Amino acid sequence: MQCAQYTASRCRSCQWLDKPYPQQLADKQNHLENLLSDHRVTQWLSPLFGQESAFRNKAKMVVSGSVERPLLGMLHRDGTPVDLCECPLYPTSFAPVFAVLKTFIARAGLTPYNVARKRGELKFLLLTESTYSGELMLRFVLRSQTKLSQLQAALPWLQQQLPQLAVISVNIQPVHMAILEGEQEMPLTEQQALPEIFNQVPLFIRPQSFFQTNPQVAASLYATARQWVRELKIDSMWDLFCGVGGFGLHCADTETRLTGIEISAEAIACARQSADQLGLKNVTFAALDSTQFATAETQVPQLVLVNPPRRGIGAQLCEYLSQMAPQFILYSSCNAETMAKDISLLADYRIERVQLFDMFPHTAHYEVLSLLIKC
């Protein structure tokens, strides 16, 4: 993959861009195998990967420059703005959208936020595309509601220029910190969820719900989890840290008793919408803390699926899972180091199967799926 900003040393987000892609995969696989070297793994599966470029479905753009000539991208360490509208990680459909958004910022008078001066209103633009429909979700992250009426007044022009904009919202992030979004979200369109489909499973993306940024590899990850779980012939499972329900909805059939737990109410609303559309009747989704939910339950499912954030599931949940002793644990991780630590705490389980999914080409990061079986 070629990138002008990387070549000019203006952006180094893709730390491994100079490394041939086959070597990237080999290095990630070696890293994973070294982390699990103290454990016996019955079956290592080959890494799964997708496109090397144009694979992201989401752009997080810092807005800088002036209201007349806004710049979308990132800020260099010295505060210099870097335009990322031509970033090769984004699909080609994004560049013309960014061009229209720059014009819209000027028309609406949305003054870009100046970090050094702590002045201005528009901090970020967050753009997400559905690979299923081609529709877009756009979020304006503002410092306050000062420019909200101006934005709303100019919005019909933007919608005319970009009819694929299905979901538009404003997020208020008032603090002068490197935080992407605040708690307050205000919808500007009647439609509030972006539809997506992976492997014939309908999924929905709301403004404040997490969704994987590499749809091609994410679909493969979900399909693999479904295959592994279906082979186990289970009839009850928990999906902890379930997000919008991608894993559980793939793994469950009409007879499976599925309980999905996620702290984000927005994500749970998406999961419930998907379950309704699939006609699943034995499914429950709840907006709760996954660890608190699990440790308060007395019934034991046959399988517990966990997909935690980078910190892992932690000692408390590991201890409880060991006591609860479900027959199977399916662990999906975006941080193999914390996963390895967690697995070490699950001493009564053996690792049946492991597979790496390269969700983040040109970086050291990757996803990994591990199936654990009670000894």
UniProtKB/Swiss-Prot annotation:
GO function terms (MF aspect): 4 iron, 4 sulfur cluster binding; iron ion binding; rRNA (uridine-C5-)-methyltransferase activity
One Pfam family linked to the record: tRNA_U5-meth_tr
Catalytic reaction list: uridine(747) in 23S rRNA + S-adenosyl-L-methionine = 5-methyluridine(747) in 23S rRNA + S-adenosyl-L-homocysteine + H(+)
Secretion signal span: none
Top class in the EC scheme: transferase
Keyword S-adenosyl-L-methionine assigned: yes
Binding sites annotated in the UniProt record for S-adenosyl-L-methionine: Q212, F241, E262, N307
Entry EC no(s): 2.1.1.189
InterPro entries named in the record: 23SrRNA_MeTrfase_RlmC (IPR011825), MeTrfase_TrmA_AS (IPR030390), MeTrfase_TrmA_CS (IPR030391), SAM-dependent_MTases_sf (IPR029063), U5_MeTrfase_fam (IPR010280)
Coiled coil (residue ranges): none
Residues engaged in binding [4Fe-4S] cluster: C3, C11, C14, C87
Domain of life per record: Bacteria
Keywords: 4Fe-4S, Iron, Iron-sulfur, Metal-binding, Methyltransferase, rRNA processing, S-adenosyl-L-methionine, Transferase
Family matches, as HAMAP family: 23SrRNA_methyltr_RlmC
Function: Catalyzes the formation of 5-methyl-uridine at position 747 (m5U747) in 23S rRNA.
Family the UniProt entry places it in: Belongs to the class I-like SAM-binding methyltransferase superfamily. RNA M5U methyltransferase family. RlmC subfamily.
Protein name: 23S rRNA (uracil(747)-C(5))-methyltransferase RlmC
Species: Yersinia enterocolitica serotype O:8 / biotype 1B (strain NCTC 13174 / 8081)
Record lineage: Bacteria, Pseudomonadati, Pseudomonadota, Gammaproteobacteria, Enterobacterales
